[in-house]
Amino acid sequence: MNSGGSDSFDYLLQLTKALSAECRANRQETDRIELLLKRLAKQSGISYDNLSKNIIPDSWKDNASQKASPPTEAQKLISENFKLIYEIEKQEYFNTKAVALINNINEHFSYIKNFIDEQNAIRERNIATFSSEKLDERNKSLQQNYESLKTENEETKKKLHSIIKQFEKLLKEVDWDRISKDSRDYSRFKKQLEYLQDTYQVLK
């Protein structure tokens, strides 16, 4: 379908919707007038048929004895158009609700993702800080014990060896992949390890 045909169809659809809404409004107004006349007849003690005889056209009145004539082709087409308009309006309503629901779900997913990313970032910073602090404490303890034990006997050497093994074990327990290699704490700790190795040759 070319753009001109599409524009014409859209215009016809909007016009048909407007006519449909106007017909519904007119029908509601007709029903309202008929209801008011029935109330007036009841309050006045006058038969509704007598009251509406010269007011309401015969085409408005219900006549069970009259048999409805079969609908013409034009009436059938109009009825089908009204059904089509109703289906289109219903589909547009559901589409609007579906889009709103999808947007709402996407908003919640975005919020959850941002929350998880933020928590992961905080956890990684905490892990790096915690590891650095613990390693600093062990490093200080190692140096102090080394100074106090280096002049003692063979038993002292065994204790020193045990401390070194504990330190090596601690290094193996650290999850290095979760620590940023560009962080200040990691650079400082790496320098401390190099210092221990160069000064005391305690690490293999």
UniProtKB/Swiss-Prot annotation:
It is found in: Endoplasmic reticulum. It comes from the Eukaryota. Disulfide bonds: none annotated. GO terms for biological process: cellular response to pheromone; re-entry into mitotic cell cycle after pheromone arrest; regulation of cell cycle. One of its GO terms (cellular component) is FAR/SIN/STRIPAK complex. Keywords: Cell cycle, Endoplasmic reticulum. Participates in the control of the reentry into the cell cycle following pheromone treatment. Component of a complex at least composed of FAR3, FAR7, FAR8, FAR10, FAR11 and VPS64. Present with 1540 molecules/cell in log phase SD medium. This is Factor arrest protein 3. It comes from Saccharomyces cerevisiae (strain ATCC 204508 / S288c) (Baker's yeast). The lineage of its organism: Eukaryota, Fungi, Dikarya, Ascomycota, Saccharomycotina.
